[in-house]
Regions:
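Substrate-agnostic recognition of the 12-TM MFS/MFS-like secondary transporter fold
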Residues: 6-22, 45-58, 64-77, 96-155, ...
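Extracellular/periplasmic helix-loop-helix junction of adjacent transmembrane segments
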Residues: 24-49
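C-terminal transmembrane bundle of multi-pass solute transporters/carriers
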Residues: 66, 72-75, 82, 243-398
Length: 398
């Protein structure tokens, strides 16, 4: 377990720093430029990178996982140094923070699937694996919450150079935690990437066929595309909303992220603790949680229109908390239903196909957020998208 703890703590600092740096970058870039196009571009790159995580999965199967983890974290350190060099050499804080965040997004193509697969390659025995996974889950939740706090420190200084220096210290700490880690892992198979891509494509097509034949699953696909588009469009508008509408509260963007994260954790906790013998968390009630997600987004737009800034701030933060809860519960109910409604040997293919389809709307949302911001005010856009989400959920009731 000693090796596992080293990896978990390293991942904790890496995830914490990466999340805080992204939040700070979005806030800082919009505050300086007041141009939504920069936020859209960063969001687009991040979302496109997510679509290619299967490549990172193949690479993590082909290369020694511990060695690959050291390499990726080491590149993060060098990348942050590069950002500092750009900042001081060209005196361009926007370029320096954008380059750093973009390269980190590309690194996540490998890092995300690698951290998911490295634990089973090291632990021995079912009990150790369960214990290790519980530690990983706790560390991930804690880093997600604390990243909002760390980004608040970055925002307090409001300086890219200071933000990158603090990030560099934490990335170096993340690297030092694994630098002496033995590269010995369970023997893996030599992976032919071309063969795996072909197999993955075939699995995706098989998953698609099952989805088309299963009404319970297929009915939600178009609805999810609409809701994902609306959510990501709204989320990418949050730096703009925080700065343009709630300029009196410097830490509004951090509060929004923290509220959403805490809501997601509370939703998962509620299902885990209360689902036995309760009729609230059943597949039958999934449409209501979907409808409530749209309502929460609508309320965010509504509270943003209030004349009282304090009332608006409290309302928006609470609405994001509510959205996090409803989204978390809804996701658990839906994917649990999927797992129960398809043969066990097809679950992976079906869920993989569903996640791929759902994510197709994300880059479109990133592209759309900038032109939408020129049409009308941000609160009106958010209110309208919340209304669309609520209307999109109606067919699921039937």
């Amino acid at each position: 377990m000693a090796r596992i703890k080293q990896i978990i703590f390293s991942d904790f600092f890496d995830t914490l720093t990466n999340g805080a740096l992204v939040l700070f970058a979005y806030w800082y870039i919009y505050k300086v430029t007041r141009d939504q196009s920069y936020i859209s571009l960063l969001g687009l790159i991040s979302m496109i990178a997510t679509l290619f995580t299967f490549v990172g999965g193949y690479l993590s199967d082909k290369v020694n996982k511990v060695y690959l983890l050291k390499t990726v974290v080491g590149i993060r350190v060098l990348n942050t140094i590069l950002g500092l060099v750009i900042y001081h050499l060209f005196d361009d804080p926007i370029l320096s923070v954008m380059v750093t965040v973009v390269i980190n997004s590309v690194l996540n193509i490998v890092y995300s699937p690698l951290t998911e697969s490295i634990v089973p390659s090291i632990v021995h025995g079912k009990e150790d694996l369960i214990t290790a996974n519980s530690w990983v889950s706790i560390a991930n939740q804690l880093s997600s919450v604390l990243s909002a706090g760390l980004s608040a420190i970055f925002i307090f200084f409001g300086n890219v150079s200071i933000g990158l220096v603090l990030s560099l210290v934490l990335y170096v700490l993340s690297y030092l935690l694994i630098t002496r880690l033995s590269t010995e892992t369970k023997a893996g198979k030599n992976v032919d990437v071309t063969s795996l891509v072909t197999k993955d494509t075939n699995k995706f097509l098989v998953g698609m066929k099952i989805i088309r034949k299963n009404f319970l699953i297929s009915v939600i696909v178009p609805v999810a595309l609409v809701t994902n588009f609306c959510f990501w469009t709204v989320w990418l508008l949050m730096p703009k909303l925080s700065i343009d509408v709630f300029s009196g509260f410097t830490y509004m963007y951090n509060s929004i992220d923290l509220s959403f994260t805490v809501g997601s954790i509370l939703g998962a906790f509620a299902v885990n603790v209360k689902h036995k013998g309760k009729k609230t968390f059943t597949a039958r009630n999934f449409p209501y949680f979907l409808l409530l997600q749209g309502l929460m987004i609508l309320l965010i737009g509504l509270f943003s229109l209030q004349n009282s800034e304090v009332f608006g701030i409290v309302g928006v933060v609470i609405s994001w908390l509510g959205y996090g809860i409803c989204n978390s519960v809804g996701s658990i109910l839906y994917f649990s239903t999927v797992q129960l409604s398809v043969p066990s040997n097809h679950i992976g293919m079906v869920i993989g196909a569903i996640l791929t389809i759902f994510s197709l709307a994300n880059p479109i949302a990133a592209i759309t957020s900038a032109p939408l911001s020129h049409i009308t005010t941000t609160p009106i856009i958010i209110f309208s998208l919340g209304t669309v989400m609520m209307l999109a959920s109606v067919p699921v009731f039937f």
